[in-house]
A protein has these predicted regions:
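Membrane helix-loop boundary segments at the extracytoplasmic
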Residues: 30-40, 325-328, 361-403
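A membrane-periplasm/extracellular boundary helix in multi-pass inner-membrane enzymes
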Residues: 145-151, 207-212, 229-271, 281-288, ...
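Long extracytoplasmic/lumenal interhelical loops at the membrane interface
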Residues: 157-163, 265-328, 349-364, 369
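Membrane-interface helix caps and helix-loop-helix hairpins in membrane proteins
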Residues: 41-42, 92-101, 210-211, 383-386
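Transmembrane signal-anchor hairpin modules in multi-pass inner-membrane enzymes, especially those
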Residues: 1-88, 97, 101, 121-131, ...
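Alpha-helical transmembrane segments of multi-pass inner-membrane proteins
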Residues: 8-17, 57, 80-91, 108-115, ...
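Hydrophobic transmembrane alpha-helices and their immediate junctions
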Residues: 237, 328-374, 398-399, 404
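Membrane-interface micro-motifs in multi-pass membrane enzymes
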Residues: 1-3, 44-51, 101-102, 164-176, ...
Length: 445
């Protein structure tokens, strides 16, 4: 039943994608971030939903008469330079077959990100993109938070199988990166209940991070929380809320969770931690011997025999930094970090341009929350091989699109606001009864 439903949804979306290519970018984001096809039990698990959506979106973009503009901001230019560099390293990869397979996957992500930047034209398009990302990951945060509460935190969490976020650690990283985006959605929510819903999902997502039993997520969550407080408008209120809620959540967790977190102090006795250190040493050795790095898919047992400090202990990179270092060398790591630095500066530039204009308050909040999202990803990612995960690149796209539609190439926004039709009618009815003339008129019995 789920398989048929997903197929119907995908087919029904094609006319909308052909009419407005941005709808294709949003549909692609849903399938790449939420992975609904991985929650099915039949043909949908292997059906090429993503490929079909991507092809239709590309065709719609080429055929559409809408203006399509990719602003060559520092973030976009740096992304293109990084694409060139990782392609060059793939040519000289130590594991050619695996390298080109992974190169193909990464290039699809980069292409869709650039395509998304091109087809997002208006303020409502940016809001729709942000809302799509939040709903796609908020599903897992909402579900995981309720599961953690229902089980008292005794059972861990898992994401959709066969995806970037299939295990507890990678799922927790995605949740940490998405929480600030949920706060951003709350800043432009059209009604009070939608704002409360966004905050509620953010709280449940934070609970799911704690319930993931991920030690890297604990550190990433701490960094994200600190910057969330620093970027908040009311630091006193936000700080008081954090000081009240966080200790209660930690105290409510079972002893097994506490033991897991305390193992950070005894990393010398933790085989997993020592294996990660060995893989980091492997990445450094590869980068020292090969200026281009080892190319994609370098972390293999065979290549470990040559470059690892302890060739008998094989682990994957377990760090976005050492993953990029080992696969693309010191230059690749520099380009990767520079891209996120430019993204941070883009956020600061948006905040500065928005100033105190109340019309742009939501945009300033969104830019700040994207910065917090980057901090969460860069901190939690220090312990996970998630350098090519889609979500952080969508955060970069949101920042670029936000600057584009507000300051670089603003377009008249004729698209309807993000509001469900029946909710719009009810709101209009409430507003009508609030008017003096309506209040004075007698109601019909």
């Amino acid at each position: 039943m789920r398989d048929i439903f997903l197929l119907i949804v995908m087919l029904a979306s094609i006319p909308y994608i052909l009419k407005r290519p941005v709808m294709g970018a949003l549909m692609y984001a849903v399938f790449s971030l939420m992975n609904p096809h991985r929650m099915t039990y039949g043909f949908a698990g292997t059906f090429p939903f993503v490929m079909i959506i991507a092809v239709v979106t590309l065709l719609a973009t080429v055929a559409s008469k809408e203006e399509k503009k990719v602003p060559f901001t520092p973030v976009v230019v740096q992304l293109l330079i990084l694409v060139f560099w990782v392609t060059l390293t793939a040519v000289f990869a130590l594991n050619p077959t695996g390298a080109w397979d992974e190169w193909s996957t990464v290039m699809k992500t980069m292409l869709i990100v650039i395509l998304t930047i091109a087809v997002v034209r208006t303020v409502n398009d940016v809001k729709a993109l942000l809302l799509t990302v939040v709903l796609s990951l908020g599903f897992w945060g909402f579900k995981g938070g309720l599961w953690t509460i229902a089980t008292g935190g005794h059972n861990g969490l898992l994401g959709p199988p066969g995806t970037y976020i299939s295990d507890n650690n990678t799922l927790a990283l995605a949740m940490i990166t998405s929480i600030p985006l949920m706060v951003a959605v709350a800043s432009f929510a059209p009604t009070k209940w939608t704002k409360r819903a966004a905050i509620g999902v953010a709280v449940l997502t934070a609970i799911s991070v704690i319930g993931s039993y991920s030690r890297g997520a604990l550190l990433g969550g701490a960094a994200m929380t600190l910057f969330l407080w620093l970027k908040s408008h009311s630091k006193l209120k936000t700080g008081f809320l954090f000081a009240l809620v966080i200790p209660l959540l930690l105290v409510a967790m079972p002893p097994a969770w506490m033991e897991r977190m305390h193992s950070i102090d005894n990393y010398q006795q933790d085989a997993s931690a020592m294996g990660r250190i060995n893989s980091w040493g492997f990445a450094i050795n590869v980068a020292n011997h090969l200026p281009l790095g080892g190319g994609f898919a370098t972390f293999t047992p065979k290549i470990f025999q040559i470059y690892a400090p302890d060739p008998t202990v094989f682990y994957v990179a377990h760090s976005i930094y050492f993953q990029v270092l080992g696969e693309h060398g010191y230059i690749g790591l520099f380009l990767y970090l520079l891209m996120f630095l430019f993204a941070w500066r883009t956020g600061s530039r948006i905040v500065r341009k928005c100033g105190t204009n109340p019309e742009y308050a939501w945009a300033a909040t969104t830019a700040r929350m994207c910065q917090v999202s980057i901090i969460g990803y860069m901190t939690a990612g220090a312990f996970l091989a998630m350098a090519y995960y889609d979500l952080p690149y969508y955060v970069l796209a949101i920042l670029v699109c936000l600057e584009k539609v507000l300051f670089i190439a603003p377009q008249p926004d004729n698209t309807p606001p993000l509001r469900l039709p029946f909710l719009s009618r009810r709101k209009q009815q409430r507003d009508a009864w609030k008017r003096p003339e309506a209040a004075a008129a007698p109601r019909k019995r």
